[in-house]
Amino acid sequence: MENAYILGGLRSYVGVVNGMYRHIPAEVLGAEVLKQVMEKYQLREPDYIIAGNGVGAGGNIARLMALTAGVDISVPAFTVDVQCGSGLESIAVAAAKINSGEADVIIAGGFESSSTQPRRGYNPNHPDYTGDAWYSVAKFMPGIHRETVMLEGAELAAKREGITKEEMDSWVLRSHALATQAREQGLLQNIIAPVCGAVKDEGIRPRMSQRLLDRMPK
């Protein structure tokens, strides 16, 4: 068995839905980061490119991203979808391929754009077709199970583990405070790949407070 190592990585600034990246397709965002990764680490032709994507942007979007970045057409690329764990699972798959001796160098990660994800519609032959033109959330559970969205899943997990809202609020405040500190001190600059004119992460809230969190429904 070969050992697998993470040699480095880059990420874009993180946006929000309908924010600074709202008009930029996922494959373009991913391609811009991929180009900078390949330049920084001098990777011309990796054995594979593996990318996670959970919103179902259609086709083999990892390969679309790779070709958009100018990667040679001979380099195989494929997409992994395990929803929120897609990017991390891509890295695990890459490690397994290297462990097995199938590959030596793989670029792995994940990318999403909820702002530009395609609309979806059932074919009239599908049993769930109701005449509606579009649906916003894909089906994850068969009819014998109730669909559970991620927020409900988080609530169930918190209840099972005995985690209170007050405990989570403290983590929220700590997280935003540390993220703000890291941004102000430039601690993340060596892993940031600036793309599409972005200059900062949109999700960090320097003014986050307990008063704001108290407004949220319990």
What do the PLM-derived regions correspond to, one by one?
Residues 11, 23-32, 167-218:
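N-terminal extracellular/periplasmic Venus flytrap/periplasmic-binding protein-like
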Residues 35-47, 157, 161-163:
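Phosphate/pyrophosphate-binding loops at sites that engage ATP/ADP/AMP, CoA/4′-phosphopantetheine
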